[in-house]
Amino acid sequence: MIKSELVQKIAEANPHLYQRDVENIVNAILEQVASALERGDRVELRGFGAFSVKKRDARVGRNPRTGKQVDVSEKTVPYFKTGKEMRERLNTGK
Protein backbone atom coordinates (compact mmCIF):
# COMPACT_ATOMS: atom_id res chain seq x y z
CA MET A 1 0.00 0.00 0.00
CA ILE A 2 1.28 3.43 -0.88
CA LYS A 3 0.44 6.71 0.83
CA SER A 4 -2.25 7.72 -1.67
CA GLU A 5 -4.02 4.37 -1.17
CA LEU A 6 -3.89 4.85 2.60
CA VAL A 7 -5.40 8.32 2.24
CA GLN A 8 -8.13 6.96 -0.01
CA LYS A 9 -9.03 4.12 2.38
CA ILE A 10 -9.21 6.48 5.36
CA ALA A 11 -11.32 8.95 3.37
CA GLU A 12 -13.70 6.15 2.32
CA ALA A 13 -14.02 4.96 5.93
CA ASN A 14 -14.74 8.54 7.07
CA PRO A 15 -17.12 10.09 4.53
CA HIS A 16 -17.56 13.18 6.71
CA LEU A 17 -13.93 14.14 5.97
CA TYR A 18 -12.69 15.55 2.69
CA GLN A 19 -9.93 13.57 1.01
CA ARG A 20 -7.62 16.61 1.03
CA ASP A 21 -8.11 16.93 4.80
CA VAL A 22 -7.26 13.25 5.29
CA GLU A 23 -4.17 13.75 3.11
CA ASN A 24 -3.12 16.73 5.25
CA ILE A 25 -3.58 14.67 8.42
CA VAL A 26 -1.56 11.73 7.08
CA ASN A 27 1.19 14.10 5.91
CA ALA A 28 1.24 15.82 9.30
CA ILE A 29 1.57 12.50 11.14
CA LEU A 30 4.38 11.31 8.88
CA GLU A 31 6.15 14.67 9.19
CA GLN A 32 6.02 14.48 13.00
CA VAL A 33 7.41 10.93 12.96
CA ALA A 34 10.21 12.00 10.61
CA SER A 35 11.00 15.08 12.71
CA ALA A 36 11.18 13.01 15.89
CA LEU A 37 13.53 10.50 14.25
CA GLU A 38 15.66 13.33 12.90
CA ARG A 39 16.07 14.57 16.49
CA GLY A 40 17.01 11.04 17.56
CA ASP A 41 13.76 10.48 19.46
CA ARG A 42 11.82 7.23 19.56
CA VAL A 43 8.23 7.14 18.29
CA GLU A 44 6.04 4.45 19.82
CA LEU A 45 2.58 3.60 18.51
CA ARG A 46 1.10 1.17 21.04
CA GLY A 47 -0.02 -2.08 19.50
CA PHE A 48 1.64 -1.23 16.19
CA GLY A 49 5.34 -0.74 16.80
CA ALA A 50 8.15 1.66 17.52
CA PHE A 51 10.30 3.72 15.20
CA SER A 52 13.82 4.63 16.26
CA VAL A 53 17.21 5.35 14.77
CA LYS A 54 20.30 3.21 14.98
CA LYS A 55 23.87 4.17 14.36
CA ARG A 56 25.87 2.05 11.93
CA ASP A 57 29.60 2.12 12.46
CA ALA A 58 32.03 2.86 9.66
CA ARG A 59 33.24 -0.27 7.91
CA VAL A 60 35.11 -1.54 4.92
CA GLY A 61 32.77 -2.72 2.17
CA ARG A 62 33.33 -4.17 -1.24
CA ASN A 63 32.30 -2.86 -4.65
CA PRO A 64 30.26 -5.73 -6.14
CA ARG A 65 31.34 -4.93 -9.70
CA THR A 66 35.06 -4.63 -9.21
CA GLY A 67 35.59 -6.45 -5.92
CA LYS A 68 37.64 -3.46 -4.76
CA GLN A 69 37.49 -2.50 -1.07
CA VAL A 70 35.56 0.68 -0.30
CA ASP A 71 35.35 2.65 2.93
CA VAL A 72 31.74 3.03 4.05
CA SER A 73 31.26 5.93 6.44
CA GLU A 74 29.30 5.90 9.68
CA LYS A 75 25.60 6.57 9.25
CA THR A 76 22.30 6.72 11.06
CA VAL A 77 19.47 4.53 9.77
CA PRO A 78 15.77 4.27 10.66
CA TYR A 79 14.66 1.15 12.52
CA PHE A 80 11.17 -0.26 13.12
CA LYS A 81 10.28 -2.87 15.70
CA THR A 82 6.78 -4.34 15.60
CA GLY A 83 4.65 -4.26 18.71
CA LYS A 84 3.42 -7.39 20.44
CA GLU A 85 -0.16 -7.00 19.18
CA MET A 86 1.03 -6.54 15.59
CA ARG A 87 3.28 -9.60 15.78
CA GLU A 88 0.41 -11.67 17.16
CA ARG A 89 -1.94 -10.39 14.48
CA LEU A 90 0.51 -11.26 11.72
CA ASN A 91 1.19 -14.73 13.08
CA THR A 92 -2.36 -15.79 13.94
CA GLY A 93 -3.28 -19.06 12.28
CA LYS A 94 0.18 -19.80 10.92
From Swiss-Prot:
A single MF term (Gene Ontology): structural constituent of chromatin
GO CC terms: chromosome; cytosol
Pfam families on file: Bac_DNA_binding
Statement: the UniProt record of this protein carries the keyword Transport: no
Gene Ontology biological process: DNA recombination; regulation of DNA-templated transcription; regulation of translation
Matches recorded under SUPFAM superfamilies: IHF-like DNA-binding proteins (SSF47729)
NCBIfam families attached to this UniProt entry: hip, PRK00199.1
Function: This protein is one of the two subunits of integration host factor, a specific DNA-binding protein that functions in genetic recombination as well as in transcriptional and translational control.
Name of the protein this chain belongs to: Integration host factor subunit beta
Annotated organism of origin: Xanthobacter autotrophicus (strain ATCC BAA-1158 / Py2)
